[in-house]
């Protein structure tokens, strides 16, 4: 039976074979997916995905409008559209 903190689904099991020939299970934290833009679905730049508890709020994502949600190109187009009055 694994330790209680390894029973969470945030850990994945890795079956490894030891040099003695015995097989054992190692536990590793799951990796998060890349953050993608909500409009064009391209990966976002400057957004951290793993071990988020180590970083402050401003280190996790850019500090502009919609930072960490849409990419800079889509934001640029959105601002242009709103300033020109079209929707």
UniProtKB/Swiss-Prot annotation:
One of its GO terms (biological process) is translation. GO terms for cellular component: ribonucleoprotein complex; ribosome. PROSITE patterns: RIBOSOMAL_L34E. Keywords: Ribonucleoprotein, Ribosomal protein. GO terms for molecular function: structural constituent of ribosome. The keyword Ribonucleoprotein applies. Belongs to the eukaryotic ribosomal protein eL34 family. This is Large ribosomal subunit protein eL34. The lineage of its organism: Archaea, Thermoproteota, Thermoprotei, Sulfolobales, Sulfolobaceae. The gene is rpl34e.
């Amino acid at each position: 039976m694994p330790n209680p903190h390894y029973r969470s689904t945030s850990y994945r099991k890795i079956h490894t074979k030891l040099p003695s020939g015995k097989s054992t299970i190692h536990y590793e934290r799951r990796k998060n997916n890349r953050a993608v833009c909500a409009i064009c679905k391209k990966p976002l730049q400057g957004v951290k995905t793993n071990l988020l508890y180590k970083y402050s709020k401003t280190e996790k994502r850019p500090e502009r409008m919609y930072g960490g949600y849409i990419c800079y190109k889509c934001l640029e187009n959105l601002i242009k559209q709103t300033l020109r009055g079209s929707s």
